[in-house]
A protein has these predicted regions:
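C-terminal scaffold of the Radical SAM
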Residues: 1, 22-43, 53-319
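Local cysteine-cluster metal-coordination motifs and their immediate loop/turn environment
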Residues: 9-20
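Short amphipathic alpha-helical interaction segments
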Residues: 319-331
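Short, amphipathic alpha-helical interaction segments positioned at domain boundaries
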Residues: 350-364
Length: 364
């Protein structure tokens, strides 16, 4: 199975922490971009040999693109690719969705939405540049459900300005009471070139130890309320994991369309140049080397709670992994950073906090 990612590089306003490629467009630019995306979908038809089972509209703010344009993209994908029981996700900003939007995309086949809540505390949302309050998030959830979209994911951000354990619990309470199916919980990362990067010395942020405590607390509370952690930053009710993102973490194939969108097809990684006008006129594809190596497979497998399996590695590469990996893992297991069961290595929540370091030690 293959996934298709559609990048919508449009936002009503830029959040101060965001490093993704996006800008505020006019209606003419939206229409021009739609034409370019439809053309690109058709031109890349020959690249995909397997059926498509996920389509993901990310951004930017796909909901700012408009329901009719999203429907046109989905219709084009259906006309040019074989879709089998697809999970079709659209990222939404609560401030840019209305009843009509959900009605249009639901009829087009969208069955999952992901909303950038970040925090349910309005003072924290304001510091993050969010245009809507907590009540608008709740209203957007209700509108989605009214139009038959019940698979809803919300983002939660840890370590944001002014956040405390008390305010974090307020956000978690909101997530749990909303009865949603999926939660992505990310730690705030200050990216170079963003307003937060310039402001970082004046931001009131929780210290690193507190953020780590917040992460472990979030894992515990979500687990107690029916959410299974299936990846470092992702939690789902049973059967509601993001099928599209699992393509990435399981080194499965996917096609990315749009400026800055990445692809992995036929063992090769490539991406489109991070330039809107270039994509409209003559999309420049930049090769990014081979993908799916043994090392990459191990690294991505260890992001998942299911972990790195000796037998699955053999199925993939025709041989067992180096025994040294399991020898090193036994030492780390003593410190509750990972566990070894049935010849499978998986990280604990404490291990996820320092996953880059652990993976580096296992592979060195």
């Amino acid at each position: 199975m293959t996934g298709i990612y559609i990048h919508i590089p449009f936002c009503k306003s830029k959040c101060p922490y965001c490093d993704f490629y996006s800008f505020k467009p006019d209606e003419t630019q939206k229409d021009s971009y739609l034409k370019a995306v439809l053309r690109c979908i058709k031109e890349n038809k020959s690249q995909i040999k397997a059926p498509v089972d996920t389509v993901y509209f990310g951004g930017g703010t796909p909901s700012f693109f408009g329901g009719e344009r999203i429907r046109a993209v989905i219709d084009c994908i259906k006309e040019n690719y074989t879709l089998i029981s697809p999970e079709i996700t659209v990222e939404c900003n609560p401030s840019s969705v209305r009843d009509e939007f959900f009605e249009i995309i639901s009829k087009a086949g969208v069955n999952r939405i992901s909303m950038g809540m970040q925090s349910a505390v309005d003072s924290e949302r304001k510091a993050l540049g969010r245009l809507s309050g907590k009540d608008e998030v709740g209203s957007a959830i209700s509108l989605a459900r009214k139009n038959g979209i019940n698979n809803i994911s919300l983002d939660l951000m840890l370590g944001v300005p002014y956040q405390t354990m008390e305010s974090l619990n307020e956000s978690i309470d909101f997530l749990i009471s909303s009865d949603i199916k999926h939660i992505s919980a990310y730690m705030l990362k200050i990216e170079e070139g963003t307003p937060f990067y310039k402001m970082q010395n004046s931001l009131t942020l929780p210290d690193e130890d507190t953020v780590c405590e917040m992460y472990l607390h979030t894992v515990k509370r979500l687990s107690e309320n029916g959410f299974e952690q299936y990846e470092i930053s992702n939690f789902a009710k049973k059967g509601f994991e993001s099928r599209h993102n699992l393509h990435y973490w399981r080194t499965e194939e996917y096609l990315g369309i749009g400026p800055s969108a990445h692809s992995f097809l036929n063992g090769k990684r490539f991406y489109f140049e991070r330039d809107f006008n270039s994509f409209l006129i003559n999309p420049a594809i930049i090769e990014d080397g081979d993908g799916g190596s043994e090392e990459e497979y191990i690294m991505l497998s260890l992001r998942l709670s299911e972990g790195f399996s000796k037998e699955k590695f053999k199925e993939r590469f025709g041989r067992y992994p180096d025994t040294a990996i399991f020898q090193k893992a036994k030492e780390l297991e003593k410190h509750n950073l990972l566990k070894i069961e049935n010849e499978t290595i998986s990280l604990t929540p404490e291990g996820f906090l320092i996953s880059n370091s652990i993976i580096g030690k296992l592979l060195e």
